[in-house]
Design a protein with these regions (language model features):
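Sequence contexts marking disulfide-bonded cysteines in secreted/extracellular proteins
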Residues: 34-36, 120-122, 168-170
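Catalytic Zn2+-binding segment of zinc metalloproteases
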Residues: 105-118, 125-132
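Bacterial N-terminal signal peptides
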Residues: 7-17
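Long, well-structured alpha-helical subdomains associated
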Residues: 130-175
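Active-site scaffold of zinc-dependent metalloenzymes
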Residues: 55-98, 106-109
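Solvent-exposed, acidic/flexible segments
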Residues: 91-100, 112-117, 156, 160
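A metal-dependent hydrolase signature that marks the N-terminal structural subdomain at the beginning
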Residues: 21-65
């Protein structure tokens, strides 16, 4: 019985480890990344939930109008929820945007008190650090931000302000 329990425990550990590796986010350069975090008494890899659905009504309501969000579960563990259908439709045509979205949500997972501008700043810096930012990608990200006319105040009030504050932060070294 003891051997059976040990084997079962080993199987569960392998399944968890392999499950996380399989669920790693695919960056536009082909790398697979996980969102590592450490805050409070918790550290590890943020959970990723790829929300796939057939009908819009089946879409995870936590997403609201976003393509990804970070939420803390009941135990305070960060969970990144990604609209898998939107990713399937748009990832090839706008790879910089998806890399940015992932690193933005990961920034929230790493520090849940981080605001939207600071999360944008952290995402921009992480992409730069990984060699994923260049003039064309920056312009793609800028175009997406500028298309957001009205945003809540925590985002700066508009996409223009959010993007301006993101670049300002990234150039200063804050975030």
């Amino acid at each position: 019985m003891m051997v059976k329990n040990i084997c079962l425990a080993c199987f569960m550990v392998v399944a968890l480890v392999c499950g996380r590796a399989v669920n790693a986010f695919p960056l536009s350069n082909g790398d697979q990344v996980e969102c590592h975090f450490s805050h409070g008494d918790k550290q590890g890899v943020a959970t990723e939930i790829w929300n796939t659905y057939r009908q819009p009504e089946e879409r995870n309501p936590e997403l609201g109008r976003a393509v990804a969000v970070m939420r803390l579960d009941a135990d305070g563990w960060p969970t990144i929820i990604i609209d898998g259908e939107a990713h399937k439709k748009n990832a090839k045509g706008s790879p910089a945007i998806w890399d940015f979205v992932y690193f933005h949500e990961c920034a929230h997972a790493q520090d849940p008190s981080r605001g939207e501008i600071e999360a944008n700043c952290a995402a921009y810096k992480e992409m730069s650090r990984r060699g994923l930012m260049n003039f064309h990608r920056m312009k793609d990200l800028e175009a997406v931000h500028l298309s957001m006319l009205m945003l809540p105040e925590e985002y700066g009030g508009s996409g223009l302000k959010l993007w301006h504050k993101t670049l300002e932060c990234a150039r200063k070294g804050d975030g």
